[in-house]
Amino acid sequence: MNVKKIIIYAMFTVIILITSGCSKDNIEYTKSDKKEEKGIEINEKNFPSEYVRELVSQSFDSNNDNQLTQNEIDAVTELRIDPDDTYTYMDGLDNSNYKYSVIDCRGLEIFKNVEKIRICVEIVEHNDEIIEEYGLLNFEKLYELDKVKELFISGEKYKAKYELNRFPNLEKVQLNYIKNLDQLKFGDEIKQIKFNFVYTDSVIDLSKVHSLERFKAIGFNCNGIVYGQNEKLKNISMKEIGKGIKEIDVSKLKNLRRLEVWYSKYLKNIKIGKIKNIDLYECKGIKELDISKCDKLKRVTVITTGIDKVRMSKTPSINHLCLSFNKIENIDLTNAKIHSLSLQGNPIKNIDVSKAKRIDKIYVKKCQNVKKGDKQQIKIIRR
C-alpha cells in the first residue's frame, strides 16, 4: 500500500513539474511573441521630418499607439504629402523655423506596398510671411519602394536629381514647379510624362522610354528633347515652351497621332513624318512648314505663326486644312483631297483649287494687315 502511494505521489509530482514547465514556456513564448510584435516607433529617429511624423501618425497609426505594426505598414498603398495638409499642419505650429516645409523622405522607405506617391513642397505663406525654405531631402530613400506606379512631385527648390529608372514599375510621372532640375533618368516602363513649369539645362532624352505613349509639357524649358524612334508614342502636347527648345523633331515617330504646340515664340522649326494631326497656335518663330512626306496626315490646324510657305504636294490624304492668320502668299493644292480649307488672314491673292476636286468649304477673309479703304481682291480658281 505504501509502495502504491509512493508511486502515485511520484506520478503526481511529475505531472505538476511538466505542467509548470509548459506554463513557464508559454509565458516566455508570449513575452517573446509580444516583443516580436512590437512595431516601428513614430519618433524623430525613424522619421526625422516633423511633418512626415505627423502624417504617419495621423494617417497610418490605426490604433494610435505611436508605433507601426507590420500590418499597418503593409496596408499603406499611397503616400500623399499635400499642400492642403501642409496649411492645416502649419496652423498648429508656434515655432518660427517652419522646418516642416523641407520634407525629409527618410523613414518612408518602410512602406513597401506603396503604388502612388504625391509630394508637394511648394512655397507656402504663414501670417503674411513667405516661407522660403522648402524642398525635398533624401529622395533616394523612395527608390526602395519598387511597387510605385505613379509619381507626382511639385515645388522642389533644391538642385533636383531624379533617377526614375530605379522605380522598376513606374508608369506615370508628373513634375511641377521645379526650378533647378539637374538630372533626370527615365525607366523603360513609363507610359505618361507631364511637366509643368520645369526648368533644366539638360537635354531630355525620351528615345529609350520605349513604353511612352503620352508626353505633355507646359512652361517647360530644357536644351532640347530627343524623341528617337519611339514606336508607342502617340500624343505630344507642348505649351509655352522656353527659349532652349528651338526645334521639335518627331520625324522618326511612326505612330504619332497628334502633335500640339501652342504659345511657343522661341520655337524655330518643326520636323514631322508619319503623323495624323498637327495643331500649331501662336508659334511666330516658325517660318516654314514641310508636310510633303506626311502621307498619313488628316488634319492640319496652323494659326497665327510666321509661316509664309507650306510644302504639301505629296500629302493627298488631308481632309481639313486650316492655315489662318499666317503670312502665306501662295499655296499648291495639287492632288490634295481636302474637304475644308481656311486661309483667313493671309496676304494671298490667288487660290487655285482646280485640282483639289473634293473641296466643299473654303474660308477666306481679308488679311488682318490690309489698310482701311484698301479692297483686297482674292481670286478663287476652280477650273
Predicted segments with their positions:
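Leucine-rich solenoid repeat scaffolds
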Residues: 342-383
